[in-house]
Amino acid sequence: MQLTGAEIICECLLEQGVDTVFGYPGGAALNTYDALYKYSDKIRHILTAHEQGASHAADGYARATGKTGVVMTTSGPGATNIVTGLATANIDSIPLVAITGNVTTDQLGRDSFQEVDIVDIVKPVTKASFLVEKVEDLADTIRKAFALAQHGRKGPVLVDVPKDVTANKTEFVQTIPEKPRTFEIRNPEKVRVVQEMIKNAKRPMIYAGGGIISANASEEFKAFAELIDAPVCCSLMGLGCIPADHPLCVGNIGMHGGYETGMATAECDLMIACGARFSDRVAGDRERFGEQAKIVQLDIDEKEINKNVKVDEYILGDIKEILIALTIGLDRQNHPDWLAKIEEWKHHFDDKKLPECDLPLPQQVLDTINEIKCPSDIIATDVGQHQMWVAQFSKIMESRTLLTSGGMGTMGYGMGAAIGAQCARPNDRVCLITGDGSFHMNLNELVTLKSYELPVVVVVMNNTVLGMVRQWQKLFYGSRFSQTDPHRATDFVKLANAFGVDGLRITKPEEIKPILTKAFEMNKPVVVDCHISPDANVLPMIPPGKTINEIITEM
């Protein structure tokens, strides 16, 4: 059948099982948006306040479901506004497809109105980017984009479509999309080698990363951890790959991880990294990271092997397939003394009492949210101290229930991510935990929450400062608080009301439970302005480039 390019875009989205897209219209995308109007009974479009919000929403949708998120924009600033969102998705291996409009093909390269070479701009922060100059190539390019986004190490792909390509017609033939190919183990001979290392280990430890969740391998991972009886230390992206209350779950690893995860890293004799990339926020001093251990890396991406930390053995392939292969023929291991030692480390700071404070403490707020929420409810975060408090204190019980910007550390990510997650999973509650600094970045997306009546609970940890940078200034820059005490006087309750959203405020510890309970029960968008002390810090902390021996526990 003969269809316009714009109609082909919509048909290809339907082929791929897309039911929701996030975006913002504009001149170069008018034909596509006109087609979306015709397809509105099949494809829901969520209009955000800003294209960056749309890109983060597509990201949140993808993280919450495992499906490919879709963002659509016009040319020029519409396209450049999603670069941060693509970079955020790229470093965290999140599958997105961005479809941008552009000027007509005869106007390309002429500095036309709202023309920008978005294809070259995003090359460093995408798996691939394509300019479609003929309508005949459009369908196959979009299909290729979706296949690339989900194949191997997942990530974002951009398709740039000039306006005349969306207007021109060509023959369109529907196809059934290929299922993502299984990424087979490339060096299967190493499976037996790693099994022998597991059998010989006395103090094994698993360093679990986001690759487990990306591969939908949480069940296989839990079975593997139980089989080898190894404690699990999770990166920020790996939280949720094993329930937080599982006996083998030790907690978050790295700069702001617990004492117990740092000691497990230092004292283990075998470290198995599953879908984790040894980032600087985890490894610290790379030369001394896991220095007593043989290190095994299980990963889908060959570029990650030995990139940050030198490993003794590695297996390349899909994490799910690797974990299944490692369990075959391997007897159950037992390490009671090692696990008892880790349990002892967990209680290393038990004698330290919570500081007395007239304002709510972050731990009190997060402990209360743990009590209120269900295991399948979703926590989204922005970036800053509140993000690290979530990693330390929130009980993440299932995969795909913690949405956070890991590698890029994108302030302003959380609002869009929460929107995308709530659209993707309307039957689960979504709570955004943010800070006043991050919230100021993309608070315009409150209009999106209200427009679609998305029942997201926004909890603002309001300390009136840029807390994480301020903490570093206190520790490493002689308490010279340069531009981190902004003296803003934003009334977040009134702000929420201005958008038509309910606002609540917490200023005392005894108000935490009743107000948060009320917020979660309202079943509509609500902002909770939770005042905390500007002197509340994220501890313990291992300074950058250091080891557990240099841990900071007090400030």
How does the language model describe each region?
Residues 99, 108-114, 255, 306-308, ...:
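Thiamine diphosphate
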Residues 158, 297, 380, 433-434:
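Generic enzyme active-site microenvironment
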